[in-house]
């Protein structure tokens, strides 16, 4: 008599897991500062939640992460590292260290850092993610630019250039076509959001990036796929 209840329990747990997996949480670490009384990190569920004082580049990254795929991410958590654009290495190191410490107790699934390659921190983040997963059992993943996917917690994104074309309407009604070009590190937030918005029941391998008009194209697709790139 006990077997049916066990089977039902497994089915219910599986259904719950699928539901939980429909919308993941993205975390962004950005070189920006939140003005009081805002609390760092800030949680963004809709665009209305984006603080007014953030840099345009930060806002753009948040919006990229929020696009998602089948679904939008459940939310985007934005941690402002307080690092100036022209900061020295010591300040950059300190900012990243604080971000790591703060993120250890925050629930999220996918991490992206729009300046991680510029800051020369990709390998440090890869090491941190591996430690979080293997030692502290926090099953997070990071989307990193041009970083070997030698661990299940590392998602290697390598496309050199992605171009978004959109039509902007001025106050006088004049329409202008504007191209926005993203480097590899700048588009990692989009990839993190896409994966977070992919239900467990489907794959995102060939997910369309409908906002793009152009990107760096591969002459040979087999080698990157074989290498999980």
Residue ranges and their predicted role:
Residues 16-19, 41, 192:
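Short, flexible coil/turn micro-motifs enriched in small/turn-prone residues
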Residues 38, 91-96, 101-229:
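A glycine- and small-residue-enriched flexible loop/hinge signal that marks low-structured segments
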Residues 5-9, 43, 77, 165-169, ...:
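Ser/Thr- (and often Asn-) enriched beta-sheet segments in non-cytosolic proteins
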Residues 30-122:
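An N-terminal, globular interaction/scaffold subdomain
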């Amino acid at each position: 008599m006990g077997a049916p209840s066990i089977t039902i329990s497994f089915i219910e747990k599986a259904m719950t897991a699928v539901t939980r997996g429909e919308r993941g949480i993205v975390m962004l670490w950005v070189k920006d500062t939140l003005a009081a009384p805002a609390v760092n990190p800030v949680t963004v569920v809709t665009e209305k939640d984006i603080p007014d004082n953030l840099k345009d580049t930060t806002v753009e990254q948040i919006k990229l992460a929020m696009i998602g795929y089948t679904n939008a991410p459940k939310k985007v958590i934005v941690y402002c590292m307080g690092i100036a654009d022209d900061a020295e290495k010591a300040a950059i190191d300190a900012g990243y260290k604080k971000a790591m410490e703060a993120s250890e107790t925050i629930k999220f699934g996918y991490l992206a850092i729009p300046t991680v390659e510029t800051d020369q921190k990709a390998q440090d983040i890869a090491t941190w993610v591996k430690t979080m997963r293997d030692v502290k059992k926090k099953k997070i993943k990071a989307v990193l630019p041009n970083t070997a996917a030698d661990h299940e917690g590392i998602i290697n994104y390598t496309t050199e250039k992605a171009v978004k074309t959109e039509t902007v309407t001025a106050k006088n009604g004049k329409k202008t076509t504007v191209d926005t070009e993203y480097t590899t590190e700048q588009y990692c937030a989009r990839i993190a959001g896409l994966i977070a918005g992919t239900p467990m029941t489907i794959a995102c391998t060939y997910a369309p990036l409908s906002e793009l008009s152009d990107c760096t194209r591969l002459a040979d697709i087999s080698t990157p796929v074989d290498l999980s790139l």
